[in-house]
């Protein structure tokens, strides 16, 4: 659930999140913006990677642990993992927004999201079954939280247009979709006993997405700062 996702992100981003609260007292908007970009990038990488692992390994794990009769439909797993990824990226935004005390400006967002979620889910469940509920959750999140929360940060704290953020967001989504597709392509060739399928998929998920993301972002400021933080966490020279 959301609590679990928040715990995962906050542990993964411990070094950055610890410093976010201190930014509330500074007027250096450029510094605040850089930390926000770093936090968002880390959330993107962590939850993109986790979403891919979940998508490729959930059903093999369920089959191994409980039997094939309990397998989820592939479409439902996909929607669940996309929701996991999108909400995971939101956690970085929410950590930042909460530390800045920007609660007032999007006070009606939760109500709008709940109403949209209910209406869309009811409409879609007729055509898609259980998957319609998860698609409804995705749609309501995209129509509200995904754009409202960054807008509040950019307008009331960073005081600059949010357009650049959404362009970067779209680029991130495009890259992650490609990485996800390549990883899925690699995993399709694996067959055999469920245990070995699970192990091999785990190896692919650990290696392929991270290498591809590194190849894309290795020259960016966000990656250099992420690598610097990781070295400090693991005491790597």
Residue ranges and their predicted role:
Residues 160-161, 181-237:
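Membrane-proximal transmembrane or re-entrant/amphipathic helices at the cytosolic face
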Residues 57-59, 66-70, 101, 124-129, ...:
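Short helix-capping/hinge motifs at transmembrane helix termini and TM-loop junctions
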């Amino acid at each position: 659930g959301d609590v679990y996702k928040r715990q995962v992100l906050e542990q993964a981003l411990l070094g950055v999140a610890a410093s976010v609260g201190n930014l509330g007292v500074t007027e250096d908007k450029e510094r605040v913006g850089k930390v926000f970009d770093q936090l968002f990038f880390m959330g993107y990488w962590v939850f993109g990677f986790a979403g891919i692992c979940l998508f490729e390994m959930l059903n093999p794990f369920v089959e191994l642990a409980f039997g094939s009769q309990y397998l989820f439909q592939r479409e439902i797993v996909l929607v669940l993992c996309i929701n996991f990824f999108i909400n995971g990226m939101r956690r970085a935004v929410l950590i930042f927004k909460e530390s800045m005390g920007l609660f007032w400006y999007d006070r009606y967002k939760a109500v709008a999201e709940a109403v949209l979620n209910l209406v869309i889910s009811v409409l879609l469940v007729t055509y898609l079954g259980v998957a319609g509920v998860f698609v409804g959750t995705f749609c309501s999140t995209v129509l509200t939280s995904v754009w409202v929360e960054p807008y509040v940060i950019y307008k009331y704290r960073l005081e600059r247009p949010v357009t650049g953020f959404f362009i970067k967001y779209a680029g991130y989504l495009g890259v992650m979709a490609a990485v996800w597709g390549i990883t899925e392509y690699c995993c399709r060739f694996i067959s055999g006993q469920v245990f070995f399928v699970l192990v091999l998929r785990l190896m692919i998920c650990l290696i392929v997405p991270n290498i591809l993301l590194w190849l894309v972002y290795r020259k960016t400021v966000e990656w250099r700062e992420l690598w610097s933080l990781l070295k400090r966490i693991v005491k790597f020279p």
